[in-house]
């Protein structure tokens, strides 16, 4: 289902340019602050493809920057973007800020090795996928196959991004209940590579991180 976006939606933020000033996309940056669905990820996919195939070779960026603040959304749309990110010849740095949750976290973890940055006050939510379905018995039984495939995709993605074993992933990142993390807990679990403010080069020490209290 398509939704009406506010005037400050991600595509407006990234396309704005005053006069002759370049837009964020022109500078190799994209700010994603939205739910994850086909409408919201399509502009990011197009941006990555344009940077790889449309921009003249001599003008291509050495690195792309994708900043993410998302409460999550559709898994299929997330994996569509993830596959495009992984196929990019230009490394993609990811910066998580505000909140990266559910499928938004999956997208963040896909950033280039050593280039996944969390800001100190970012909230991280990792949990099992949820799925609502209806239909006749034989239709629901057929859907079980996709449940199994989705679970396999999730585990493979977490494993490749964190280098944790399946047992540890299920215990610390995909347990039965939601798992909220602060930036330093995420760092220890291999979700990110560094904790820093977007324009800061030195990592932020643990003492400066605001702790997140969860219910």
Give the location of each predicted region.
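Terminal-region recognition feature
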Residues: 1-215
């Amino acid at each position: 289902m398509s939704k009406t976006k506010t005037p400050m939606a991600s595509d407006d933020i990234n396309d704005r340019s005053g006069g002759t000033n370049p837009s964020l996309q022109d500078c190799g940056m994209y700010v994603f602050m939205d739910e994850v669905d086909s409408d919201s990820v399509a502009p990011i996919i197009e941006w990555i493809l344009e940077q790889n195939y449309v921009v003249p070779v001599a003008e291509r960026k050495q690195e792309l920057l994708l900043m993410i603040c998302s409460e999550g959304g559709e898994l299929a749309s997330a994996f569509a973007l993830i596959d495009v990110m992984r196929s990019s010849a230009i490394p993609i740095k990811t910066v998580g800020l505000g909140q990266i949750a559910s499928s938004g976290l999956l997208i963040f973890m896909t950033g280039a090795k050593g280039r996944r940055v969390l800001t100190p006050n970012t909230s991280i939510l990792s949990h099992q996928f949820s799925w609502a379905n209806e239909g006749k018995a034989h239709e629901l039984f057929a859907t079980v196959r996709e449940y199994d495939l989705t679970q396999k995709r999730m585990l493979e993605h977490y494993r490749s991004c964190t280098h944790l074993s399946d047992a540890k992933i299920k215990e610390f990142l995909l347990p039965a209940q939601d798992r909220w993390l602060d930036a330093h807990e995420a760092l220890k679990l291999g979700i990110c590579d560094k904790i820093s403010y977007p324009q800061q080069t030195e990592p932020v020490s643990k003492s400066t991180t605001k702790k997140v209290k969860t219910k």
